[in-house]
Amino acid sequence: MENEDGYMTLSFKNRCKSKQKSKDFSLYPQYYCLLLIFGCIVILIFIMTGIDLKFWHKKMDFSQNVNVSSLSGHNYLCPNDWLLNEGKCYWFSTSFKTWKESQRDCTQLQAHLLVIQNLDELEFIQNSLKPGHFGWIGLYVTFQGNLWMWIDEHFLVPELFSVIGPTDDRSCAVITGNWVYSEDCSSTFKGICQRDAILTHNGTSGV
């Protein structure tokens, strides 16, 4: 009986240990699932934080150190180092380049050389130019008829201003604080870029 009892006791203990070990292993899948879920949550938080920081960085690029103008209940924003006026942004280059090179630089900034629409805009640009400084604008002479044309393919309205100097099919226009002059397009001057301002309404970007 002792051997039999001893055998039964040992067998019972082994069965208990086996059940306990099996129970312990059965908890591992749940543990790993919880760990996986927690890891996914942490990764998601990092991703959302990165998106949020990127959004605010982009927003700061257009809102920090710039003027904000309100027109008809809307706000207009320009990138850093651009001037804001009547829903448009203006950038005055610091590099001397040809007319075509200046236009190419403006295009890379998602803009174009200045196109003056009215006398108010003309006055704003001339007041913004430093004394003695010249700037390329988006005005050139056509190959036919020696007519002045803007880069948006509209002809210059004589009532807006007159271009001073001789003209030919290689002429482009530069502006100063007082006048607009005809110059050879291969000459080098600083360019004036123009683009539409970013429209916002009630603090929400329109783009």
Swiss-Prot record:
One of its GO terms (molecular function) is carbohydrate binding. Its main location: membrane. It comes from the Eukaryota. Signal peptide: none annotated. GO terms for biological process: natural killer cell degranulation; positive regulation of cytokine production. Keywords: Cell membrane, Disulfide bond, Glycoprotein, Lectin, Membrane, Phosphoprotein, Receptor, Signal-anchor, Transmembrane, Transmembrane helix. This is Killer cell lectin-like receptor subfamily F member 2. It comes from Homo sapiens.
